[in-house]
Structures are given as structure tokens and as C-alpha cells.
Amino acid sequence: MLIFVKSGENMLESILKNTSEIVSIEELTELLKKEEKIAYIGFEPSGRIHMGHYLQIRKMIDLQKAGFKIVILLADLHAYLNQKGTMDEVRALGEENRKVFEAMGLVADYVYGSEFQLKDEYTIDVYKLALSTTLNRARRSMEVIAREDENPKVASVVYPLMQVNDIKHLNADVAVGGMEQRKIHMLSREILPSMGYKAPVCIHNPVLTGLDGEGKMSSSKGNFIAVDDDEATIKKKMKNAFCPMKEVSGNPVLEIAKYYLKYPATVKRPEKFGGDLVLESYEALENAFVEGLHPMDVKNLVSEQLIEILRPIREKMNK
């Protein structure tokens, strides 16, 4: 696959698009000047890859086009510590996830955590990190990620230290993740320099709300659109999605419209309901919705575009 590398301001503009936060833009700008640079993201192997994952993968593709070598950590050992299944189960899921990422068009080095996280050098560094991190700081960094548990395991404290250590051992210049990763990434910027390693640039992407409007989109909750869902499934899920009239905040349908749809976009309606409506931007869509555009009109628009956006992935997965 050919990768067309962008240059100058176009690279930075592409990376900035649809991000929630970059720490820091100045450091990223300097990093873009280097010939060799690595960007990494870690994924706990998951049952289905959904639109929330796709938001992250698209950012990795932006970084790839900006000249970064991309490393995808298939975090099998992390998943095990986070009680997602046996090592064999999460490894099998990891292989399925890798195939989907490749179908998305991402060219990357895929690394399983268990390939390096059980080595002596890695383990010693985890001990060093443990000496540099208070118990409260480690636990706070996991609050958003770990499953709620009335009796948290010691593993929930080891997990963030391992994630910080991954950045060092993968030689990453940039760490990418959703906003739920922010506390761990900030921990890495604080303590890695004390071990003689650079503080990574951290790129945080939005976390999509689940289709039920409750919490984040998650394969374990079933409130997602998978990137390989067929047309009928996409339409059904979107039809049933939470989309309260005139409400923008926490609206999963509008979030998908914001981050995925191409504009100008046309809402197709019968003449008796006002006829077709051309929207030049997401802001125009949001304004129309607040002013009374029917949720089903928005859902139909999103379904129509999602089907086309995901078509190449479905076709590759079905070969």
C-alpha cells in the first residue's frame, strides 16, 4: 500500500482535526521535523471493533501520513489484568482485531504486550516506576478505565505502571488514546523523564457516547455500531439510537455526524415535510436540529453515509 506523506502545515492540521487535546502542540510541531518518529496506541483485544475504535485508527492514519512509524500494541496482558478473559481468549481476539485494523487501511507494526512485557528488563522498569509513583496517584490514573469494582485488585495499580512502561519500551514519541487515557498519559509525562526517557507527546481523541446514551460506546455493552456491520444492522441500530429532540449534549447520533459525516450533506425529505435540506457543515446540522429538524431525518442521514463510509471495510472483511 502506498502512503502519501503530507508536508508542512497540512500535517499538523490533519493531526489536530477532531482531537480533544494535544499535549503539547509545540512539542508535536518540533517532532514533525524529525525523519524518524514513532506513534503508538494500545488496544485491549475486544469482541467487536466499533466506531469508537475507528476514530482512533483514523488518527493513526493521519500520523502515518505525517511520516510517523505506527505501532499498535495489542494489549493482551493488560486485558488479562483488567479481567477481560484468559490469555488465550484475549490473544485470539487480538488476531481478529488486527485483521479489522488492516481492513481499515492502517499499515502498522502489530505487537502483543506479552511479547516484551514478561522480560526481565521490562519487569525491573515496572519496579522502578512503582518506586516513583504513589499508590493514590496510580489508582487515580485508572479510575476512568478500570471496571467498577467494590474490591479492586492490586492489578489495577500495576496496569497504569505497565502502560507508562510500554511507552518507553516501544520507543514511542507520541502516545495516542481516548480522553479516558489522559490520567495515565499525564503520569507518563511526569515520571518517564526521571528514568532518563523523553516525555511523550500525548494525543487525546473524543470518546463516543454509546447508542443508548449511557456512557461510552463499548463492545461489552452492545451499544455500538461495528465497522463491519451490514447495511440492515446499521439502519436498525441507528433507528433505535438515543437522539432526544433538540438535545445536543450526550447525543450519540450527533457525535457520529460530527466526526464522520462528509459535508455538504443532504437530508432527504418529502415536500410535505419541507423537502430536501442541504447542510454545508456539522454546525449547520446541529443548528437545524436545535431548531426542530426531526431526529429520524438526522438518523437517516447518518445511516446513509455510514453505510458508504464502512463499505470498503465490510468488503475487505468478507473476502
From Swiss-Prot:
Q: Which family does it belong to?
A: Belongs to the class-I aminoacyl-tRNA synthetase family. TyrS type 3 subfamily.
Source organism: Methanococcus maripaludis (strain DSM 14266 / JCM 13030 / NBRC 101832 / S2 / LL)
Per UniProt, the short sequence motif 'HIGH' region occupies residue numbers 45-53
Q: Name one GO biological process term.
A: tyrosyl-tRNA aminoacylation
Using the UniProt record, name the top-level EC class of this enzyme in a single word.
Answer: ligase
Where is it found, in Gene Ontology cellular component terms? Answer: cytoplasm
Query: What is the recorded name of this protein?
Result: Tyrosine--tRNA ligase
Q: Which gene encodes it?
A: tyrS
Q: Motif location ('KMSKS' region)?
A: 216-220
Location comes to: Cytoplasm
* Lineage: superkingdom: Archaea
